[in-house]
Amino acid sequence: MKKNLGLILMSVLALSCFVSCNSKKAKKDAGELVVYGSCEEEYLAAACAKFESLTGVRTTFQRLSTGEVLTKIEEEKGNPSADVWFGGTTDPYNEAAAKGLLLPVEPKNASHLVGKQFKDANNNWFGIYRGILGFFWNTEELQRLKLEPPKDWDDLLKPEYKGLVSFANPNTAGTGKLIVNTMVQLKGEKAAMDYFAKLDKNICQYTKSGSGPSKLVPTGEIVIGIGFLHDVVYQIVNNGYTNIGMTSPSSGTSYEIGATAIFKGAKNLDNAKKFIEFALSPDCVNLAQDNGSYQFLVIDNAKPVEVAIKNGLDKIETMVYNFDDAKTNGPKYYAEFFEVISKDDRVKTK
């Protein structure tokens, strides 16, 4: 009896070792994936951790603004150090696609996108969320200064706002590029550049990242910001700030499409394709609102973003944004923008 029990025990141990060893081998065989992420880091980290837990693929990431990613992959052309780009506005993605830096793919989950505008016509990138551009301000500071909050774009030109306004540097942030393109589409190219030349007099800082102003407004370092309203909701809901007001411009505003794509020359291509499928699934996009990212989702099987709805973002109407014009002429507009503003230490790159 003891002999039989010993044999059984040895068999169980051998089987356990076999399963364990093969499990480790399978995990090793799953390989790795490197992600450049331009969404907020909480969501980026959660998405990469979830992908790794679902697939066994060892996933590492680096958080960079879209402008930084674009610069980096241009320098690495043909030999990228990352496989996938996750999050951030599509204007820089379009620049990357035009330079042949992205790999077209056809993920099955793209069938769940709620509109054709949420993917590149040539399958270079795919949308994962939508964010609305607007204004926000420190209510305590405006009260102290005895100033009314801005209601429309031209209000930002008021001389009493001198040194109070901020938005993102178009060289480092897709948000800045979107603001430039939005004004061109609302006012026309020349009028938009005249507008930015005047607005520059009121700018205290062009931040490195798109979410920068939303982080600095509640602390009083900046009084009025231009950026995405979901970033403001984060400051209210997650950080508990009660001194922030926000609105959308009365004459019209635009929106970002946050995207994901594979870099041409990706070293872990099969895993990169798996990640794109994952990025277009509820497993990924539903993590956003659980990690402080309150953009509207653009796949038909995702959960509604209740926090954004409670804060009224679903009631904001947006303009028909011309993505083709931004894609074709954006680089020219950005160059013109930097010609009309004062290039000094207010333009942040770090």
Label every model-predicted segment.
Residues 24-95:
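Early extracytoplasmic/lumenal segment of secretory-pathway proteins
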Residues 91-95, 218, 224-243:
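A ligand-binding cleft/hinge motif common to bilobed small-molecule-binding domains
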Residues 37-45, 80-221:
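Extracytoplasmic ligand-binding site segments that recognize negatively charged/polar headgroups
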